[in-house]
C-alpha cells in the first residue's frame, strides 16, 4: 500500500471559505487531489482550465506531485487588473488635488 499524506484543499469566496481535509497517496498530482477532494462538486464554478492553483500561496501547475502534507489553494480569477485600478485611483487623486 502506498504511503499517504494528509492535505487540505481550500477555496475561498468573498463571504465564506471551504476547507476539505483528506488523505491521498504520496506522489499524487495537485489535480488528482483536487478531484478526489470533492470540492468541484461543491463549487461547480471552479474550472481547472481557468482557475489557478497554488501551495501555500505559491502558484503551481496541476501536474505538480505532492510528496508531503500541504495546503492546496484554488484561486478565483481577478475581477479587475490591479495596475488599471491603481492608475484610476492616481488619476482620481490628481483631479481632486486640482480642485
Swiss-Prot record:
From the Swiss-Prot or TrEMBL record, give the protein name: Protein RnfH
Against InterPro entries, the record matches this protein to:
Mopterin_synth/thiamin_S_b, RnfH, RnfH_sf
Q: Which domain of life is it from?
A: Bacteria
What is the similarity comment for this entry?
A: Belongs to the UPF0125 (RnfH) family.
Coiled-coil positions are none
Q: Which organism is it from?
A: Tolumonas auensis (strain DSM 9187 / NBRC 110442 / TA 4)
Alphabetical list of NCBIfam families matching this protein: PRK01777.1
